[in-house]
Amino acid sequence: MYPNKINKKFKSKADTLTFLQKKLIRGKVEEIFSFTVLDWKIDKKQIIRKTIDKFYPDEIIVRSSARGEDSVDTTEAGKYKSIQNISTQIKKNLENSVNEVILAYTEKENENQENQVLIQRQTTDVITNGVVFTRTPDNGSPYYVINFSDSKETDNVTKGEISNLIKIFRNCEKKIIPKKWKKLIFVLEEIESIFETDFLDIEFGITKKDIV
């Protein structure tokens, strides 16, 4: 997600999602825990303990949240690393996953100690996932552009592995929107209202219970 007209204090994916989680009603942002690379170097044992306390026994996803990645000023979606389905019952797996995400920063020559690692509860029962632009990315035409995959994996679109495409006219009557996409459109409208812009790029997942 990179809202491009929001408050300048949002410098990362973690900052943006933390703000949105407190505001969003129609959709859901999974539980969040984030920390900086410097925090990890200073006391990774405490971070591991806090992560387990917060998410146990659920599985988690460990995600990159570099300064400038999916922020107000720029987007680097898919540039770094995300690791899914990490058990909170095995400390070593958690530690290794965080180390991999941090290593990806180094490999991309971004060693900012204020880069973050974002941990969220792993969404379950996903049936559709993808990335949606709230206007066409090339010229801003009034269409929702939805790149999607009907898969339980939540990152195969951002990785470029699978992508189907549908466009929905922003001003069309709601009754003609395919049922599959109605809830997503309602959530997008709420997010646009929260950030006061209709130029957004948002990763999404839809569950069997139609939770977005």
Feature locations, PLM:
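Nucleotide/phosphate-binding sheet-loop regions of phosphoryl- and nucleotidyl-transfer enzymes
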Residues: M1-V212
